[in-house]
Amino acid sequence: MSSYVPNTLSVYHNLLILEASFRKTYLQLQVRRQKYMAFYVSLLVWNFYFGYRVFYRISKYSLIDLTYKLCLLCGIVTLLLFYFSGLYRTTIVYPSRYVQQVNKAMRFFNIRLVITPVPWFQVRKPLDCGVHLILSSKRFDILVIEGWEAFRSSYFASIHRKNNSIQSNESSESPSSKQN
């Protein structure tokens, strides 16, 4: 038997691809969760408002009172459909448990997915926002872990430099030079 030791750069590259895949899925799930959470909150506000108008502030006009009751009924039916169709679970509950489920699946490989918090007021998000992979010291040597962190940070630094050079080239070109 020959003991095959894989090239560490190819392993780092594959880990980077895996991390990018996890990051993309995590960010997509967070956007979907925010969208449906806004829908869910607006639906709750809708039901509370029309419930208040139907039960506590009854209108003296029967047509307006009937409209309030129909709006409340539509809101309750929509809320029940949202729960019983499974949309609540797949759009709000599952995205918040994504990292836990990935960590359970990756436990065998001694790799963890960790959320990197980014301030909400930061306009330009870094390239590695969302999540990143951490190698466990149980299975991996300290040199491999440090090599992975160095490879990862140098990769994102090179991507950042490339994006900055592209932006500076685009901003340095003037509209008059493009027309000539």
From Swiss-Prot:
Glycosylation: residue positions: 163, 169
InterPro entries assigned to the protein according to its UniProt record, in alphabetical order: Spo7
One annotated GO molecular function: protein phosphatase regulator activity
Source domain of life: Eukaryota
Disulfide-bonded cysteines: none
Subcellular location: Endoplasmic reticulum membrane; Nucleus membrane
GO biological process, one term: nuclear envelope organization
Alphabetized Pfam families for the sequence: Spo7 (PF03907)
Record keywords, A-Z: Endoplasmic reticulum, Glycoprotein, Membrane, Nucleus, Transmembrane, Transmembrane helix
Keyword flag Transcription: no
Subunit-structure text: Component of the nem1-spo7 complex.
Annotated function: Probable regulatory component of the nem1-spo7 complex which acts as a phosphatase and may be required for proper nuclear membrane morphology.
Record-given protein name: Sporulation-specific protein spo7
Organism: Schizosaccharomyces pombe (strain 972 / ATCC 24843) (Fission yeast)
